[in-house]
Amino acid sequence: MRWSDSENNKIDYIEDFATHFLNKNALLNVICKFCVFRSNSDLWVMRPYQICATERILEKIKEDNRNSKNSKNASKGGCIWHSTGSGKTLTSFKAVQLASEIDFVDKVLFVVDRKDLDNQTIEEYEKFQAGSVSETENTNDLKEKILDDSTATRAIVTTIHKLKRLIDQRSKLKDEDLKKKNIVLIFDECHRSQFGKMKQEIDEFF
């Protein structure tokens, strides 16, 4: 494996590698947060850019939470770019898992744009950790799991279509606390889902 720093500069010398990755904080983070035992007992260690991407997502969540208390116009969100075959699924899994452990986060929704990706994501996440996320059968199931306060449903995989149908039922949600929850939305394949009317209405609702 070729290692690099947070700016994607290659690290070729053992002294530089030791400085960046063998200090106690970095090494402890890799061991405790950025390793995954798959269901077949293989140990996967995240690549440097996957670790940086995941850490930046978590930093952005915390930053936006702080800013939201100071300004109604605080910018929210961001974009992580992964090329095909670069390990997007593992990055997204760790981002969802670690975001759901942040104390002020009530729910993390990993939103895909097709039903087959919904099933595929669940299958892949189950290989990383059984029971790590909840799947949604339909819009009502999604609503119930968002409103459920148990830790078993803190991380949810769903489709953008179910989420859109849910906010279309806002008249039925007026007596419930859906909008009061701190919900992190992570969109898969955002180049296909970030510019349409569905995404705009979801942003406006939350």
From Swiss-Prot:
Gene deletion effect: Non-essential, it can be deleted.
Record-annotated membrane-spanning stretches: none
Pfam families: SWI2_SNF2 (PF18766)
GO molecular function: type I site-specific deoxyribonuclease activity
Alphabetical UniProt keywords: Restriction system
GO biological process assignments: DNA restriction-modification system
Function (record text): The C-terminal section of a putative type I restriction enzyme that if reconstituted might recognize 5'-GAN(7)TAY-3' and cleave a random distance away. Subunit R is required for both nuclease and ATPase activities, but not for modification.
Protein name per the record: Putative type I restriction enzyme MpnIIP endonuclease subunit C-terminal part
Organism this protein belongs to: Mycoplasma pneumoniae (strain ATCC 29342 / M129 / Subtype 1) (Mycoplasmoides pneumoniae)
